[in-house]
Curated annotation (Swiss-Prot):
It comes from Lactococcus lactis subsp. cremoris (strain SK11). One of its GO terms (cellular component) is cytoplasm. Homotetramer; dimer of dimers. CDD domains: S-AdoMet_synt. It is found in: Cytoplasm. This is S-adenosylmethionine synthase. Binds 2 divalent ions per subunit. Belongs to the AdoMet synthase family. The lineage of its organism: Bacteria, Bacillati, Bacillota, Bacilli, Lactobacillales. The gene is metK. Signal peptide: none annotated.
């Protein structure tokens, strides 16, 4: 008997310690951008029992009450009771923020392309150099309506459903910390066939019984989210498999900004360049170029030019023009990858300033991305999720 073709992805809830840290970092970023759209921000957060540490480098004219932003973010997530060992009222907030390095700033504020012109007129979109070197990936597939791999899409929706049920009071014993994991079986043609395994661990009140947790999660979460045709008698369910999950959140484990980069992106289905997103303004190509790469990939697939598309971008610090652009369609392209690459260069400006202008990234829009994924979101409007370039790409390649 042949082996099944299985692929697994996971997600975590907004109350997971690492996601608490991400949301704090992005809430601070948004608060600064609301006053100073051109601020340079690299804000990191550590959370643990009773304590939040905020540190990093920020250059801005804005004044933000960091401690207030931290407490409001924790409150919004749902850590409102001291019995959780971490709540917005009593948490200690320690802030250590300094100005961005002048060595980095000189390359971001004036790209190499500008410095090499010796005072001559230059393209305004050459003004901003990449905030660091590195490579970034974007991916899209027609496997789901949101152009995301099925396993990560379902994983996000499961933990989001848990949060919705908790916040509405429908399941009153739920607490903020939770994780999900979904294993999808594929057929020999690479098409998603069924859900093989679902794992959900959710923090709960001490009074909740294992039986009621199991029944509620199966009936009100899993069956409400995963289409019935993907579940069968062979699907395996693991609900709080350790037995109990009362101690959770930052009381149970420390959290750090940028430690859930696979959850943030494609659930391991596509490569990751290694750079985290949260707490970084758009001059940091770790973030903005990853968004641009997703935008390119999604428009390719939405145009019907490929069933799957993967884009790699790379940059040198202080240089505006990407050092490389790579396209891979895994044999599903309706035109060659070389033709796609030529069209991408004409349709998308992938210099940092070009990306910022194209996606309007100087706005305080980042806090909403810090939980439940940066891509494939249908509950919020994100500029890199638009498919407004699909027709232009298609028309160019049909000539």
């Amino acid at each position: 008997m042949s082996e099944k073709h299985l692929f697994t992805s996971e997600s975590v809830s907004e109350g997971h310690p690492d996601k608490v840290a991400d949301q704090i970092s992005d809430a601070i970023l948004d608060a600064i951008l609301a006053q100073d759209p051109h601020a340079h921000v690299a804000c990191e957060t550590v959370v643990y029992t009773g304590t939040v540490n905020v540190f990093g480098e920020i250059s801005t004219s804005a004044y933000v009450d960091i401690a207030h932003v931290v407490r409001e973010t924790i409150k919004k997530i749902g850590y409102t009771d001291s019995e959780n060992g971490f709540d917005y009222k009593s948490v200690g907030v320690h802030v250590s923020l300094v100005e961005q390095s002048s060595d980095i700033a000189q390359g971001v504020n004036e790209a190499e392309e500008v410095r090499d012109k010796n005072g001559q007129l230059v393209d305004p979109l050459d003004l901003i150099g990449a905030g660091d070197q590195g490579m970034m990936f974007g991916f899209a597939t027609n496997e789901t309506a949101e152009y995301m791999p099925l396993a990560i899409s379902l994983s996000h929706k499961l933990v989001k459903k848990l949060a919705d049920l908790r916040k509405s009071g429908e399941i009153s014993y739920l607490r903020p910390d939770a994780k999900s994991q979904v294993t999808v079986e594929y057929d020999n043609n690479g098409k998603a066939k069924r859900v093989d395994t679902v794992v959900i661990s959710t923090q709960h009140a001490a009074a909740a019984t294992n039986e009621e947790i199991h029944d509620d999660v199966i009936n009100k979460v899993i069956k409400a989210i995963i289409p019935a045709e993907l579940l069968d008698d062979e699907t395996k369910y693991f609900i709080n498999p350790t037995g109990r999950f009362v101690i959770g959140g930052p009381q149970g484990d420390s959290g750090l900004t940028g430690r859930k980069i696979i959850v943030d992106t494609y659930g391991g289905y596509a490569p990751h360049g290694g750079g985290a997103f949260s707490g970084k303004d758009a001059t940091k190509v770790d973030r903005s170029a990853s968004y641009a790469a997703r935008y390119v990939a999604k428009n390719i697939v939405a145009a019907g030019l490929a069933d799957k598309a993967q884009i790699q971008l790379s940059y040198a610090i202080g240089v505006a023009t990407p050092t490389s652009i790579n396209v891979e369609t895994f044999g599903t392209g309706k035109v060659s990858d070389d033709e796609l690459l030529a069209a991408i260069r004409k349709v998308f400006d992938l210099r940092p300033a070009g990306i910022i202008q194209m996606l309007d990234l100087l706005r305080p829009i980042y806090g909403q991305t810090a939980s439940y994924g940066h891509f494939g979101r249908t509950d919020i409007e994100l500029p890199w999720e638009q498919t407004d370039k699909a027709n232009e790409l298609k028309a160019m390649l049909e000539k």
